[in-house]
Amino acid sequence: MALLQIAEPGQTAAPHQHRLAVGIDLGTTNSLVAAVRSGVADTLPDENARHSLPSIVRYTDTGIEAGFEAEAHSAKDPQNTIVSVKRFMGRSLADIQSGIQDLPYRFQASENGLPLFATEQGTVNPVQISSEILKPLISRAESTLGGDLEGIVITVPAYFDDAQRQGTKDAAALLGVKVLRLLNEPTAAAIAYGLDSGQEGVIAIYDLGGGTFDISILRLNKGVFEVLATGGDSALGGDDFDHLLHHHLLQEWQIDAPSASVSRQLLIESRRVKEVLTDESEVTATLLLDDGTTLTHVVTKSLFDSLITSLVKKTVASCRRALRDAGIKADEVLETVLVGGSTRVPLVRELVEGFFGKAPLTSIDPDRVVAIGAAIQADILVGNKPESDLLLLDVLPLSLGIETMGGLVEKVVSRNTTIPVAKAQEFTTFKDGQTAMAFHVVQGERELVDDCRSLARFTLKGIPPLAAGAAHIRVTFQVDADGLLSVTAMEKSTGVQSSIQVKPSFGLTDEEIGSMLKDSMANAKDDIARRMLAEQQVEAARVLETLSAALAKDGELLTADERNAIEQSMAVLVEVGGQDDADAIEKAIEALDASTQDFAAKRMDNSIKLALKGQSVDSI
């Protein structure tokens, strides 16, 4: 007899069957993979009991090495050994070369200005390199868990933009792995601590990794993780501490032009010194030169602190801005969570504690907390915990909008809006008979397009040729849970539509985002004045165009004196419209409107006469 398995739609017929999914912290310096096993989330070690994997890839003439093997050869073969590739994701070659000094790589530019690394295996891009880091982590997970993965959650800095997020997803796609979600690193940390402690209130997530810094202010309430505000710097991390010490030691030893191998060796030594100073008051730095000479120098904790103080203070300034954005005072923060290996630096903990007024939480290993949170989220998304009521609400770092006539920005989705989100706004045509409309999608807080960042352009065709202002075009902005944007424009009467997914060729650094926010505040008064001027100039152009068309059609209804008076008022508006005086333009528009009142009445009377011509009183 045949047996039928019956299950609820969308659920497995075997409820006990555990689906395999993992969380991956794809870090700048190190990467980790974690999974939920027997209800407990933890990172997965390799066969040598090492939990982390160095985010390093080496390309040789015989193959590709990743992780510890690549790290072992990085000093001897720096040109073919790519470290901290996360810092290059979604950035142009020009940005990289201007922002990061002393890079040993042989760069080439792709057709759209993105960086290519020339290696023994040919040219490779950051997406391909990131894929090589993911590969051993996924292999480790599948061998440990005993099966193929149904999906992964990858963590990214909260301030990663569309290009950086898409590049991260593409790295997994190269391996044929399904990405269940890109999860902001601070949010992942909140998941790990929130589920462990069950606390409710405002929490600050201070995430200082190898190459990026993020501060997120979250409200935890009944299973809801709402990000109130975010901030940070995608080009500031522990690597920068290493580079400062590296530069200081070169000066101490009077080395002006080190070879690539010596420079890489010293960078590795600088990192070791930094780590030792976490527990010791001083350590001796050592460097072996190409001629066999060994150099030494004692580095004290106070010296190291003096080198990095300005950078750590920059992170505290970001915390202050994030709190202001969230409308929260430092003493209202319930807990501060430290994330990232660089938070082990004593000066970092000291300044963070001083700012928030309380000792930060460190009960979960700061190196592993993000991966653990990602594993918990992966376990939920793959369907192993259908009863979970955990809800994540991330936010947009910058406003998204559309260019309107006069180079103005109409914001559709505001900064700090929770995502995923879909918002729509209606626009209309500017000219009679207009059958197409060009859309310019921009990002930023300023009032004029020239001061914002261009994201994409697309055109909607097939609009019915109606009078200006008669067509209704609904523009919908949709940002998914990964922070990727799609924009759709639809003409409501016909249903004709056009859309675009925004994948900019390269992204903004968090320093640039912070600069944009500061510029918007510093120029707010001037921007409003410029916007008012532009709005009046657009209105003047619209009035003149509409009136010119009316005169061409019904000018015979006017006497010569009446027409002359209107044309004189039009000439005044044309002259004033070219000036930078919004009030004068507004007054000229009002004067022209007053001079055309009789003309408008005559046109209305004439239209009624034409409509009633030939009809009897009884038929009306």
UniProtKB/Swiss-Prot annotation:
One of its GO terms (molecular function) is ATP hydrolysis activity. Keywords: ATP-binding, Chaperone, Nucleotide-binding. Pfam families: HSP70. InterPro entries: ATPase_NBD, Heat_shock_70_CS, HSP70_C_sf, HSP70_peptide-bd_sf, Hsp_70_fam, ISC_FeS_clus_asmbl_HscA. SUPFAM superfamilies: Actin-like ATPase domain, Heat shock protein 70kD (HSP70), C-terminal subdomain, Heat shock protein 70kD (HSP70), peptide-binding domain. The keyword Secreted does not apply. The keyword Nucleotide-binding applies. GO terms for biological process: iron-sulfur cluster assembly. Transmembrane segments: none annotated. PANTHER family: HEAT SHOCK PROTEIN 70KDA (PTHR19375). Belongs to the heat shock protein 70 family. NCBIfam families: HscA (TIGR01991), PRK05183.1 (NF003520). Chaperone involved in the maturation of iron-sulfur cluster-containing proteins. Has a low intrinsic ATPase activity which is markedly stimulated by HscB. This is Chaperone protein HscA homolog. It comes from Shewanella sediminis (strain HAW-EB3).
